[in-house]
């Protein structure tokens, strides 16, 4: 953990978790833990964000604020002025969609809402200002570790202990 904190400049108010289950498990773990109001905004840019959307819909309302589905996910849509309801719990992106080969060059304007990012295919490949995010996760088998493990970097204020309706895993 110390090495990762040093390498990424992870602030002290973030926890670093090493979890089994891989990145796909985070598609459901994130909405189960972060949807306080039952609403999240997702940006659909390819196969991975599409799968994350499907899982999040099982936990609450999902608003797809921007999508590149119209051109078979060949671009990242303009995210400078997204329609984000005030009671949105978080904004979710897959920052690098490997199947269609698109990546964000600029983070979306979340208008003060928590930004959640799947960085599986780009984890540790370039500098990342962790403070721009509420939560970052990455399946480490693509870049830095064994299959079936994920690194989650989460801001401490997002960790909840008031949830008694979650599965045991």
Regions found by a protein language model. Name each.
Residues 116, 130-141, 150:
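Conserved active-site segment immediately N-terminal to the catalytic lysine
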Residues 56, 68-123:
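Active-site phosphate-binding strand-loop segment of PLP-dependent enzymes
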Residues 47-48, 67-71, 96-100, 120-123, ...:
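Short acidic/polar capping segments at secondary-structure boundaries
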Residues 35-50:
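Conserved PLP-anchoring active-site segment centered on the Schiff-base-forming lysine
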Residues 16-20, 42, 64-67, 93, ...:
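General beta-strand structural signal in soluble alpha/beta enzymes
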Residues 75-77, 101-107, 125-131, 147-150, ...:
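A short secondary-structure junction signal
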Residues 140-169:
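Active-site C-terminal subdomain of aminotransferase-like
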Residues 1-26, 33, 46-47, 55:
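Conserved N-terminal alpha-helix of the aminotransferase class I/II PLP-enzyme fold
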């Amino acid at each position: 953990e110390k090495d990762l904190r040093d390498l990424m400049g992870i602030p002290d108010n973030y926890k670093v978790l090493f979890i089994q289950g891989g990145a796909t498990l985070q598609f459901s773990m994130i909405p189960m833990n972060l949807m306080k109001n039952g609403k999240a905004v997702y940006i659909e840019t390819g196969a991975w964000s599409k799968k994350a959307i499907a899982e999040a819909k099982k936990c609450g309302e999902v608003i797809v604020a921007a999508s590149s589905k119209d051109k078979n996910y060949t671009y990242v849509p303009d995210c400078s002025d997204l329609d984000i309801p005030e009671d949105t719990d978080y904004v979710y992106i897959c920052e690098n969609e490997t199947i269609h080969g698109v990546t964000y060059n600029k983070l979306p304007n979340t208008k003060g809402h928590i930004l959640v990012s799947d960085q599986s295919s780009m984890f540790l490949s370039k500098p990342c200002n962790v403070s721009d995010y509420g939560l970052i996760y990455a399946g480490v088998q693509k870049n830095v570790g064994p299959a079936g493990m994920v690194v989650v970097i989460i801001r401490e204020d997002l960790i909840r202990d008031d949830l008694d309706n979650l599965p045991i895993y």
